[in-house]
Amino acid sequence: MRLDENEGAFTIPEFGKIQFEGFCRFIDQGLMEELHNFPKIEDIDKEIEFRLFGNEYELAEPFIKERDAVYQSLTYYSELYVPARSIRRNSRKIQKQTVFLGNIPLMNSHGTFVVNGIYRVVVNQILISPGIYYRSELDHNRINYIYTGTLISDWGRRSKLEIDVGERIWARVSRKQKISIPVLLSAMGLNLEEILDNTRYPERFLFLLKKKGRWEREEYLWSREKAILEFYKKLYCISGDLVFSESLCKELQKKFFRKRCELGKIGRRNLNQKLNLDIPENEIFSLPQDVLAAVDYLIGVKFGMGTLDDIDHLRNRRIRSVADLLQNQFRLALGRLEDAVKRTIRRATKRRSTPQNLVTSTLLKNTFQDFFGSHPLSQFLDQTNPLTEIAHGRKLSHLGPGGLTGRTASFRTRDIHPSYYGRICPIDTSEGMNAGLVASLSIHAKIGDCGSLQSPFYKISERSREEHMVYLLPGEDEDEYYRIATGNSLALNQGIQEEQITPARYRQEFIVIAWEQIHFRSIFPFQYFSVGVSLIPFLEHNDANRALMGSNMQRQAVPLFRPEKCIAGTGLEGQAALDSGSVAIATQEGRIEYIDAVNITSSVNGDTVRTESVIYQRSNTNTCTHQKPQIHQGECVKKGQILADGATTVGGELSLGKNVLVAYMPWEGYNFEDAILISERLVYEDIYTSFHIVRYRIEICMTSQGPERITREIPHLDAHLLRHLDENGLVMLGSWIETGDVLVGKLTPQTIEESLCTPEGRLLQTIFGIEVSTARENCLRAPIGGRGRVIDVRWINRVDDSGDNAETVHVYISQKRKIQVGDKVSGRHGNKGIISIVLPRQDMPYLQNGIPVDMVLNPLGVPSRMNVGQIFECLPGLAGNPMNKHYRITPFDEKYEREASRKLVFPELYKASEQTANPWVFEPDHPGKHRLIDGRTGDVFEQPVTIGKAYMSKLSHQVDEKIHARSSGPYARVTQQPLRGKSKRGGQRIGEMEVWALEGFGVAYILQEMLTLKSDHIRTRNEVLGAIITGGPIPKPDTAPESFRLLIRELRSLALELNHAIISEKNFQIDREEV
């Protein structure tokens, strides 16, 4: 998207660019770097040498298409080949060969991966950058301050330096154990003279090393061996004497210094910059000079000569992108490969072997499979709509390995920091436990080389006042100490820029300052927000909490049967649709030769270019992905022109809902508490009808009794359930499936003994002498809510890692879901609600021209939620619909003048009333409101009502997937009460509050039924079914239910005996019985 301003033009970056850049960095740099670090391997006798030449690696072209990998449940990958050399020194024989190391999953054009047929995305992680950070905290008495310096390694491990109240310096090796700094420095190889020669504050250092008023020089003159022994005792909490040995020294080096003191290149750079050191960046481990400089700085902080760090500032954070995560896994795989080659090379001395024989290719494949299958940052891609895919790839997570958890993260970490300005969206985050821990990148932010977040600004020249765009890092001098004007205060009009004051950001504070003192300015009002928030028109009129809900609920909107683009938008809809990859684009200029539903063939300079369309493809969230051609045969197209629209695009613009006529008024209580009543027009005209594609799968395994069989001949099953199967036992294409119908007929072999275990098997064998079947039916049936049309059946046959033949059958069923009571709908401003009733259109309130409204919303949902943007949105929708106009409005239009949004809306309503000759569209007495007529009585409502065309979406929270009922089902073994949940065919548990509600109505018999024979009274529960069939009286329980018996047993386990008594109805005498 290109936006022109007075000073120039700029282009909004591609939304998926961050994922693409990260993966390209891994392929171009990460692979070569790790292969270059792969060591030379020799056997014990040094007769054979093995080496890889990583600079010449090759990635083969994938042998399978991405779409075929999805259908066949395969991984979309490329094969990695690396030249290798083995040398036999005895025979002086040199063998060179290009060896196959394994498979590397490839990123597709959407910035995602296909692993085992499932789309997955790798989420960027935001972590504390490795280095040292100084803070002050109160002691346990909350009186004095303790100054600490925390050294954070590249893997997130922490070591802490601290000055206590007694002014001693300690290094904390664990939560409970600490060691004095002289012992640590002595263990690292320094003596007291070297310490005092290299410190900036020798006097202060000696003063802080005092103990009880006297010098203990022998403590500071400890030998290295003695210091290592003392360090080892403190680290492992060992009492008693130890004997120094090299193995003890190596263990300390491996367990402590290698794990907690590995800084990495980024940590080394941060440490050099913080402590003013000049150590090469390839020195990735902490040195004694680092500890000494850190102690010096800590002393300076103690006496006011240093500055404390803000750990939440983005300059102290880094982004671990997909490149870093994949490179770590590749490093892990090469480490396993090194161990495997060392084991193999021992046996290779006795026989002839090639370099390929020394290498096993399964290690790399298994490592990446484990990463994509189980790593917290490799997530199941949310494909509800294209916006969801874009937003998922742009997430930033504080969670994951080396990060925080939802339970331990503080409020300060979750809060918005001023350094997020232009880099992380202050609105878009998760709701619930992860609020503030999963954020989203701003649309202009990009990730730098060191994992830092950058944001663009226009730099204003002091002399000529000309501007040019620069990217600022968080914490840079320009970002901290220069004044940056905010985008919501700038006008495109040059005259308004010369105003005296403007809001600006300076040193993490927001101030008001003269325009002449501004150094930088924002390039666009949208640059602080994420993609989802940037699609909300009139955003500035909404409370941030409701904007957050609106942004999240746009990602839950399902694709509709006939999508429609919004009348009032922000202008980013086209960019979002383009970058999502849901539309087909012409790659070159040419002429359309042939077009159908599947292929678009164009002629480009005499060559034929074929573009495949996506036809009724299932997404991860069971929504329908589909493309519709938008060009005609013989038409000439240009490069970049849209060839086919997606399921949620119209004319290349993202279209997640429908423009419907809404009225803000109460209606007989049916819109109480955000409920929504709708017209039957939305049902019968398929306004909110959506298609969903569900996949059911069944595996054909090899059992101990033989292979399972797919067949139509299923004994003891009603022929009606098998009516859709073909001769192979698979459901036929185009069949209409109801709940319980067999989709795939399967027989599992079993022994005769297993067959005779069933009662019917023994009965048939005894009475009739019939041979019992040696196979049991194990068919795939349509579950509850699985009705629909079969659109595809795929029988997948592949060989697994163990060499066995694995067969799977996938059945795809298309479901057409109309909107109904219980479905959830939402606008873009957090105005959500559940459908409470579907009214006949003649009963709906109607306009003065006789058009009935489509939805009635509760007006009380606007003032308390402070999302007035929905009112500003629906009024231009009302004006633009008859004039066939669409509005694209950037937020913060108040920068032009006060009440700019109102001054935009009312003139448009006036124009619409003039052009349509309907004066009621704009009534000066109450602009924006209209007189509505009750459809039931024909009377005019007493008060004028706000009506308009609002853009409402149907969300994925649909009643078909949530509602559940059962007449019979399983019970819990212990309590004998119904199980919980739809997936287990559970029932309703009558709990405490339900009992209170029934007691309030005095329904004693219903309450007794609910608590006994319908719940956990076993004997009566079994007798009820027979009583219902025979028409006899319902039996009454005369003993305690099972839950009460369970309570008695639990009390008995606590040595408490509880007896109960039953009073006779005849003589009111107590009849005691054992429970």
UniProtKB/Swiss-Prot annotation:
SS bond partners: none
Keyword tags: Chloroplast, DNA-directed RNA polymerase, Nucleotidyltransferase, Plastid, Transcription, Transferase
InterPro entries (UniProt xref): DNA-dir_RNA_pol_bsu_ext_1_sf (IPR042107), DNA-dir_RNA_pol_su2 (IPR015712), DNA-dir_RNAP_su2_dom (IPR007120), DNA-dir_RNAP_su2_hyb_sf (IPR037033), RNA_pol_bsu_bac (IPR010243), RNA_pol_bsu_CS (IPR007121), RNA_pol_bsu_protrusion (IPR007644), RNA_pol_Rpb2_2 (IPR007642)
EC number: 2.7.7.6
Protein name, as recorded: DNA-directed RNA polymerase subunit beta
One of the protein's GO biological processes: DNA-templated transcription
Record organism: Pinus thunbergii (Japanese black pine)
CDD domains from the UniProt entry: RNA_pol_B_RPB2
Record text on subunit structure and interactions: In plastids the minimal PEP RNA polymerase catalytic core is composed of four subunits: alpha, beta, beta', and beta''. When a (nuclear-encoded) sigma factor is associated with the core the holoenzyme is formed, which can initiate transcription.
Family: Belongs to the RNA polymerase beta chain family.
